Amino acid sequence: MVGRRAVDWAVLGAGLFFAAGLHGDLQAGDRAYGMTGDAPRVILWAWEEPEDLRTADPRQLGVAFLAERVFVAKDVSVVPRRQRILTPEGMWAEAVVRIEAGRDFEDNAATRKRTAEVVLDAAQLSGVRGVQVDFDALESQRAFYADVLRQVRAGLPAGKRLEMTALVSWCSQQQGWMRALPVDAAVPMFFRLGRHVGWWGVREPLCEGSVGVAIDEPAIANESLHGSQRVYVFAPRSWTAEQLTELNEGTIPRDRRGAR
């Protein structure tokens, strides 16, 4: 049996803390665009929901948990995670930082620097192996985003991975704006595509090693398990013990509870 002493990330004041450390060292990435590092093949996205993942098998599953949201306007404000996560000891973990641009978004040296600092703070959480940035940047915001990622890369400790989520349309461009980004990998989000399902193929090398799917879109989610990519799985509500059991066994569960 896998050890079940829980790791508990929760909010304490303005930051996150953990109750028991994760063990094991990061393997330094070589910047290859495939499945690098020691992460398991299937990673659970854990958004702003109370999560109990203690029945997950850390040999099979990892977690990318929302650590904080960053709102960029004339200045930068930060909202830390407010919901508790319980995980089994030794589970591979990655901090996710969600960036959102307000109507009065300002791109300047100060907002770029502060945003990068927030991402770096999340990367310093004990037990996390790296950081994933989630920002649906408009074309006019891409220079801002690229510079934030460059500053984060420059400040990351050796061995910590830097990843990003990516719209599928970004990944469809072979020589697009992503080609010079200093990230280890980008995760194309193959869900919530509506009528655009099947429109885009992946041509950007950064996007070739991973895929993001949702359990309430089972056709695409199940197909992802037949490939060789790392699979990030999103659930619209908190993960259940039943769903985790299915994932432990190598299958994608259905979202039987329906939408909110």
What are the functions of these language-model segments?
Residues 9-15:
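Sec-dependent bacterial lipoprotein signal peptides
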